[in-house]
Amino acid sequence: MSLPAFTEISSFSNTEISVAIIETENQLFNLRFKKATRQSFKSHEIKNAKRRLAQLKTLLSLRLENLDQKDDNLINTLITN
């Protein structure tokens, strides 16, 4: 699995990001389980899953932060008017 660039992930909707986070967490769990039970797996897939999970969570937190800033700006304009 090749990792998509952050710019490609940023075009996802919030719902798609949430679904991708859940899928990636499940994939990471399965890879860790395979490692613990000494089944065959590709070790680089753990690194890729962690990186993808970090990218998705970062994007989601950035969007939430932007929403908070917009709400704060709206509240400030309402207070001053």
From Swiss-Prot:
GO terms for cellular component: chloroplast; cytosolic large ribosomal subunit. The keyword Zinc does not apply. One of its GO terms (biological process) is translation. InterPro entries: Ribosomal_protein_uL29 (IPR050063), Ribosomal_uL29 (IPR001854), Ribosomal_uL29_CS (IPR018254), Ribosomal_uL29_sf (IPR036049). Keywords: Chloroplast, Plastid, Ribonucleoprotein, Ribosomal protein. Pfam families: Ribosomal_L29. The keyword Plastid applies. Its main location: plastid. It is found in: Plastid, Chloroplast. GO terms for molecular function: structural constituent of ribosome. HAMAP family: Ribosomal_uL29. Belongs to the universal ribosomal protein uL29 family. NCBIfam families: L29. This is Large ribosomal subunit protein uL29c. It comes from Phaeodactylum tricornutum (strain CCAP 1055/1).
